[in-house]
Amino acid sequence: MKSRYAVRALTELARRQEGGDGKPVRLADVAESGEIPLQFLEQVFATLRRAGVVRSRRGAAGGYALARPAEEISVLEVVTALDGALSPVECTQGLCDRAGRCGASSVWVEAQQALAGVLGGTTIGDLLAREEALRGRAPMYYI
């Protein structure tokens, strides 16, 4: 759940910073837009700050900003910062004593590699572009 909220919040942060002056965005605004509990988001962003994904500024004009362009922050980086290494099962971490004789272990390793490939090849910038495209295709209602 942390990763899901974090990706949603980072995409919103990228949207608010897009074409802007790089000023920090209040986390309360991001939480409200993303429908994420503020206290939870504060904990998530503290971890993301330590991981170098976001930067923060204190004070009246404070808030958070992406530490790098959205196109340089992969979803995999966010997930591993919050949840650790991707491991659907223990044997992908080398912790299974049956790995050398288990037919399923290679399947789990392939699944892990595929997931890492998708998440590593997708950036916050990509997600923002996808959301903007979806919004552009939304039906318009006129009164």
Regions found by a protein language model. Name each.
Residues 45-46:
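Short, hydrophobic-biased segments on the C-terminal half of alpha helices
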Residues 32, 49-50:
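Alpha-helical residues within the helix-turn-helix
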Residues 24-35:
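A short alpha-helical element within helix-turn-helix/winged-helix DNA-binding domains
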Residues 52-66:
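Beta-hairpin "wing" of winged helix-turn-helix
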Residues 8-19, 81:
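Short amphipathic alpha-helical elements of helix-turn-helix/winged-helix folds
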Residues 75, 95-143:
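C-terminal regulatory/oligomerization modules of transcriptional regulators
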